[in-house]
Every structure is written in C-alpha cells, then in structure tokens.
Amino acid sequence: MSAATDQILEQLKSLSLLEASELVKQIEEAFGVSAAAPVGGMVMAAAAAAPAEAAEEKTEFDVILEEVPADKKIAVLKVVRTITGLGLKEAKELVESTPKAIKEATGKDDAEAIKKQIEEAGGKAAVK
C-alpha cells in the first residue's frame, strides 16, 4: 500500500460509529452509489458460513444500549459520552434512539465493563 492509503486507513480506524455513518452517507451522495448489501447470492453465502463461525469461540462483542428511563437520561448520557467520545449532541441522539450499538467489536471484559457502567447509571444494556 502507498503512504497515502495507509494514512487514510488509519484515519478511518479512529472514526466513531456516528462519524463512520456520516462518512458513508457523504460517499453515497458524492459518488451516487449505495452501501446497501446486495440481495441474493450474498445472503446464501452468509447463511452457509454461519455454522462454521458458530463453532469458533466468539471474541468480539457489541454493547447495545436497549433502554433509558427518562429520569436516568442525563446520567446515561454522561456515561455514553465517556465511552464513545462523542459530543453532547451526538451522544444525546444516540441515547434517544435506542436500541443502538454503543461499542462494537470489543473484547468480552471491556463489553461487560461498559454494560455495568450503563446499568449503574440507570440504563439497560446488552452484550451481543
């Protein structure tokens, strides 16, 4: 790879989920393409690969914010901002649009710690 592509790749790795989503939308608009998964053959290939993956031990987990009681929204919002590094507006949108992934592809211990922080703040989270 060239130095330019390496640099772009490193910048992409540092994006938050919200920033990555915004980037995808901008690319779709700029180039007139769609990031939607093709239907048909890919679905069949994914279904065939699923049993083989099930045999392997899962090492990456997603933390999903499932529910936030109205009286606990501020406390959960603070925890979400700490975990994700999002700004106030982005974190508020994430908290208000549950269920939503807060952290993806993280280790089991980290995922459990994040879930515990959210639950201590009054929210409901799941590790998947």
UniProtKB/Swiss-Prot annotation:
Gene that encodes it: rplL
Alphabetical GO CC annotations of the entry are: cytosolic large ribosomal subunit
**Which family does this protein fall into?**
Belongs to the bacterial ribosomal protein bL12 family.
Instruction: Write out the entry's keywords from A to Z.
Output: Ribonucleoprotein, Ribosomal protein
Keyword Ribonucleoprotein belongs to the record: yes
Example GO molecular function term? Answer: mRNA binding
The cross-references to Gene3D superfamilies, in alphabetical order and at most eight, read: 3.30.1390.10, Single helix bin
Q: Summarize subunit and interaction data from the UniProt record for this chain.
A: Homodimer. Part of the ribosomal stalk of the 50S ribosomal subunit. Forms a multimeric L10(L12)X complex, where L10 forms an elongated spine to which 2 to 4 L12 dimers bind in a sequential fashion. Binds GTP-bound translation factors.
BP term (GO), one: translation
Matching InterPro entries? Ribosomal_bL12, Ribosomal_bL12_C, Ribosomal_bL12_C/ClpS-like, Ribosomal_bL12_oligo, Ribosomal_bL12_oligo_N_sf
Protein's name in the database: Large ribosomal subunit protein bL12
Q: Which organism is it from?
A: Synechocystis sp. (strain ATCC 27184 / PCC 6803 / Kazusa)
Q: What does this protein do?
A: Forms part of the ribosomal stalk which helps the ribosome interact with GTP-bound translation factors. Is thus essential for accurate translation.
